């Protein structure tokens, strides 16, 4: 069998048993798989590539087991795998079925022309191209270093020497791909003003008509859950992967004494780049999350428990005492704090409650199983289709909600910041700025950016708008954690 593309797959801890008609010696290959993976040092969830002729290249796939790759986040590993697979597919389909060992500089340049300039190609943006080149370059740097190929097909140029007494000197052999795009970083930041977000949510997610009224023919069983998911994302700035990884232990129940805002800790194990941080949630949104937990979530959990679905989970992690979130893998004697579990492990995490076992993951589907990122992406796609069908010219994706949070929050924080400074004399302003910091840095910390330079893109978005337009697009009704901020300043 021959297909036309390299494919990305994930290493599974267990394989399904072949049919009974398969010879017994073949069935042996599926037994003791978990132990074998540990012996050879393969982590479940590690990506690997399958060739168009369905071959597993042992040498090529060692790249994903190298120290540099194993230290990266799982999503980053799969990003590298997809970008490498795309280049290898190009070699196969457009370069006479050339193998990765035979690729030369001319193949990389042909790939550049097709990806960015060819009228029949995808014409990708500079930032996307740079990401793809980085993945392919990392693979070939590894292949050259360990001796699998003599040279890399990605042409290199020497980095310019740094200047300044406090900057580390670069060595002469430090290089970077010569084909990096110079137009990266100029892409427009897509965001929705609060009013447009509500229209998109009501029409696309809740199934309302264009006039904002409930539509009789809409059968959205999970409209309330999906709308709550979107509201939480647009009001916290969490990434899709981060919000998908939340458990019932991270998100608190709302109580009246929490005030208009409360916060929870996003642990390092699920925060991108290890950017653990406090996440602020409006009380209104947290109340909607509570309603989902009490009704929709509780119903599917009860149905799954009655059907015995959780008892059939293979090798789950179990929290034996919900008051103390420590988990133990079935068959293991070691306990691990839930906050240290990655997304893959959290999807196998059960909580032993008086009613029986139930998943620790916050967001569950109709079968009572944790929802995947792909399921949420399809929810956004379906919502956009409903908007088009209703004649509403709005579309949204998960990261666009993160952009919306950043732009709206930065604009409102700037207004409050300037108003506070205007009422103070110079020494008070200095003290206020030292304690509170500036709005841009506050947004940076909420987004989990390492550098404020990354967050500056949202300041540039606001700089492009006239003040009257900013006041119209970002009304004052979008409440902020002002009381929390004031308490922080007062305590300091």
Region locations from a protein language model:
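C-terminal secondary-structure termini that scaffold catalytic or DNA-interacting sites
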Residues: 2-5, 453-456, 467-492
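N-terminal core-binding DNA-recognition domain of tyrosine recombinases/integrases
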Residues: 60-76, 84-171, 207-210, 214-217
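Short, charged phosphate-coordinating catalytic segments
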Residues: 146-150, 233-259
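Conserved tyrosine-mediated DNA breakage-rejoining catalytic core shared by Y-recombinases
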Residues: 160-164, 245-352
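Long, amphipathic, Lys/Arg-enriched alpha-helical "connector/arm" segment
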Residues: 168-222, 265, 271-273, 284-287, ...
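Basic, Lys/Arg- and aromatic-enriched nucleic-acid-binding interface segment
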Residues: 202-240, 428, 437
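Short functional hotspots where side chains directly engage DNA or cofactors
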Residues: 256-259, 265-268, 397, 421-462, ...
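Short, basic (Lys/Arg/His-rich) helix/loop patches that form interaction surfaces
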Residues: 377-445
